[in-house]
Amino acid sequence: MANEIVSEFVNSNSKVDIMLFFILACFIFVMILRLLIYITVTYAGVSNSPILINGAVNGNNLRVFEQDPSVKGSIPIKRSTNKDGISFTWSTWLNIDGPGTTQGYFTSDQHIFHKGNNGIDPITGVNIPHNAPGLYLSPNNELVVYMNTFDSIDGNKVVIGNIPRGKWFNVIIRVSEQYTLDVYINGKLVKRHILSGIPKQNYGNVYVGLNGGFSGSISSLRYYPRAISNIDILNLIRDGPNLKRLTVDNSNIFSKGEQYLSLQWFLSSHSPDYL
């Protein structure tokens, strides 16, 4: 009788040990799986949708992001995934001090950023010939977007007027389904343009603040090799700009007071404009 009790106790302990071992093994497996997912998302995600300016800099600070992966410090921009035609997205935050003006050059537009060659036209202030895309600030307080296509170098131009000053606001340039170029301001679609042809992407560098740049600041410049979703856009607006200074300057726009532009500015006076 005593032997049977001892045998049952040993068997019972063995079952408990097996159960505990199984639970521990499952826990370790889940932790390893989560670690692998984190590593994959972190490193693959950064290379696919890099943040070129992870902070805030003055708009007149020239920055060049090399696309040659053999160059130390380069941030290569991957081409569109092409699942539904050429699709990609650029997002950035801007704080504009004033409209485009001449700064010792015969320029009319101020350069914010573009992807392509280094060939600013001294008369117009616009890069020639490659803008894929290009974002500029006009003397009329307008944002101007250029997008090269295979059939037209400068025929696809989008203008967004009445841009506010002294407030941080988000700009998204999204190309989807090959021919549709959308411009969002603070998550609201303010301009839709049907491209005249297939977008002409290039292997050129990304330039910020060429030819004296613009009067203001830029933050959180980011690229996606796809057309981001509305949820992605809302998340970008929710996260806001990264206001960490990347350079030393005397600007006070990095203060925490009134740094974001209210969506009411667009909802009350601007409806989407479809071209």
Residue ranges and their predicted role:
Residues M1-L275:
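Extracellular glycan-associated modules
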